[in-house]
Amino acid sequence: LQCAINNSLITVVAYDNHKPVGMGRIVGDGAVICYIQDLIVIPSYQKKGVGRMIIDRLVKFAKDIKFQDTEVMLDLMCAKGREEFYKKCGFTARPNEKLGPGMIMYL
């Protein structure tokens, strides 16, 4: 786990009185592809703005690494039932008119 966090482009941790209550991180190439790999919030802190705060910080990071005319793709796969949260944060569901459904392979 520590190796994964160390190799992330950014890791954001939300605290309440020095207790970690949520975490999110981005992996990618640091230029055009950023992927929100994890967004985890302790259940008792869900629906209180913690996840949104973490997402906002991750989105800001991705915007800040954007090169002059290069589009940065910030991508994620959300847990089933969490689609509306990410739509409220500005993400677009796939598939859509521009993108296919995406694929995954577990190794």
Regions found by a protein language model. Give the residues of each.
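A conserved beta-turn-beta hairpin within the catalytic core of GNAT-like acetyltransferases
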Residues: G28-I36, Q46, Q68-T70, N96
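C-terminal "cap" of GNAT-fold acetyltransferases
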Residues: Q68-L107
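Conserved acetyl-CoA-binding loop-helix of GNAT-fold acetyltransferases
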Residues: V41, K47-A62
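OB-fold and OB-like single-stranded nucleic-acid-recognition modules
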Residues: A4-I5, Y15-D16, P20, P43, ...
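Active-site rim helix/loop that mediates acceptor-substrate recognition in acyltransferases
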Residues: L1-T11
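Conserved beta-strand in the GNAT
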Residues: V13, K19-G28, V32-Y35, I40
